[in-house]
Amino acid sequence: ARQRDPLTRFGQAWANPLVMTGYSLSDIPCEGRLEAEQGQFNLRNLVANVRVDQEQVRTFERLCEQLGIAATVRARIVARVIAAYPRLLNPELADKAAVSSTFDSGRSTSPDASGTPLAPTRPMLRTLQDLRSIKGVTPQVLETLAPYVTILPANTWLNGNTASAPVLAAYVPGLSLQRAQALIAERDGGHWFINRGDFVNRLRMPELEMASVKVGITSDWFRLRGQARSGQRRVV
């Protein structure tokens, strides 16, 4: 399918409901659907190349502000995510040390000591539900975040063809929610983004540098949500 259509968008076969009725009377019927996870903000992006990605932090903050998540709560979420991954304490010093010297005395005062990533201090997050232990992250907060935020095993770009208006507005500094909603309406009317350049051009923001926009047109990560029924029992 990818060879015939390079885009990942709604209306393709993956977006159709999945129904498996079974081949015999003993088989339990199942139904489900695939969700393109790259239409959401990926919390894994807060750390990339053992560095805290400050632009992605600002993107998440803009999204939370739109959703009405308190600044203290979103700051705790950011801190919790960052603590789950190796990261450089002083990436600028590490870059300079890598260029200026290859000597490592093994002491913390060595210029190269700044090039050793800090080990994670918290367990890796696998789902949004793992945020429940954070002060202020209530079931209501998780319910608010769920349509717009995900946690994937790798860094990803946002798919402009499956993203919602709030996520697009958060990803592009200066893009209003109203303008993002207009772009989504145009997209869902059949005018899909064909590449990153097309997306940037349709923003009509000439001051925006295309290289700074991490919005693509495809998805590599999907989540399967399904359920099986047997009599009065249902397994999700």
Regions found by a protein language model. Give the residues of each.
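Compositionally biased linear targeting/interaction segments
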Residues: A1-V236
